[in-house]
């Protein structure tokens, strides 16, 4: 599975940003032909992206392109031209606003036909964005619809519009979505809730059930470092693999948060050692720092150590 701690969005109409993106520390770069590009600029942006894929040194980064959505007149031309005119440097196609498994299966068939027609050597992987009500209720079928599927993203902005949410920001919390503490004297604290928790958790569970990466939605206020870090830390703790980022100043933050800390790795290694010793003594559980460790602890600790080793290997390439 690819490392996907940070995934930097780069508008296809903004050629001046391509080189900067290639020099960033983002694990994955996605060049965008969809929401960040006006209708009048769609074809020009596609041409820009094709040239950038072929001409720019993207180093060892994973390179993706977000094409236009399934219900637009642009999507087939996007896919055809990308697979016909780009080198094998292209790794992934990102599909926005996916509503059901049938769409993914048709896209898989289309991509397969073009791969054969244009004699492409590398098999293209898929990233799916869930950002509609239909997409969320059908996410389990969508996740299984193609062997090309690698990651499921949550798109909070369009999802908010699809449910009629009274928000204008992309991702983050909303001060109006909260509850008052039960009345105790004259003091009643107000607690802001996470209005995206259900959608995030459903996507997270589905992604991991079918061996896909779970990627959190972008945080629109790129000037709010603390807000970004708070939500990223929350989704990392839940089990998300990474986060879509919309500004270069969010890349290092995401890479740091979605990587196990030295303390986490050291503790995980110690847990594995303790459990190995317990196994030698015929024990299935052991006390460690005042907590009970058992077989489940081995799985959790192994995940942390594997992720740390994978990041270390990537840095050595």
Per-region residue spans from a language model:
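Expand to "…catalyze enediolate/carbanion chemistry for C-C bond making/breaking, isomerization
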Residues: 1-317
